[in-house]
Amino acid sequence: FMRISRLFADPGYSMFKIARMADVLFVTGAVYFVVKASGKLFPKEKYSREVRWLFAALAGFMPQAIFMGTYVNTDSLALLAAAMILYAWASYLREDWTWKNCILLAVGMAVCALSYYNAYGWLLCSFFFFCFTVLLCREEAFSQRVRFLFSRGAVIAAVTLVLCGWWLIRNAGLYNGDFLGRKSCAECAEKYAQKYYRP
């Protein structure tokens, strides 16, 4: 956004406003996926429309969610990833692990991998959720469940790696193998943080 804005505006304070647009769009996308997930979690046959919207409103109007959409940081990207993954899980509950839901889960996991590493708990939970729902909740023979697990799981892993692997490889090359950037983050904190906040 900032590079595009340089074509139309002078550098300065307006650049900060424009840089925030990415975060505004990420949080808007997160609210969109939470609204979609609420439709799956609270179907209209059992729940009123107010219940579905209350769930979405509680998530979308949390002060933290609103705050994340107003400043320049990747917290909002992690929020978008969490909402996408939640929607994939909710879609599984209604439709099983269709190809569409598997791809959606993979895209959500890739977005999560591109955000903060403290959001990686969603990746771990997605792995266990997928494995447990395939192995324990399907009614076919166990050998077919295992085959289904590896065939769909391989596609999920491949799509996730294609979408986010380039970033991790780039980081490993730039930061001497530190593909998550933890060592680099600690070095910057040591260099720039105030005395009492240094690691």
Locations of regions flagged by a protein language model:
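Membrane-interface transmembrane helices that cradle and orient dolichyl/undecaprenyl
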Residues: G39-K46, I85-C102, C112, V134-E140
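Transmembrane-helix motifs of polytopic, lipid-linked glycan transferases
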Residues: K17-K44, M84
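Short acidic/glycine- and proline-prone juxtamembrane loop motifs at membrane-interface regions
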Residues: Q64-L77
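Transmembrane-helix signature of polytopic, membrane-embedded enzymes
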Residues: D10-Y13, V34-F61
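Membrane-lumen/periplasm interface segments of specific transmembrane helices
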Residues: F132, S151-P199
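Perimembrane helix-loop-helix junctions
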Residues: S91-R94, W122-L161, C185
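Specific aromatic-rich, kink-prone transmembrane helix
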Residues: F33-K36, L77-E95, L104-M109, S126
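Membrane-interface alpha helices of multi-pass inner-membrane proteins
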Residues: N101-Y117, L123, F128, V162
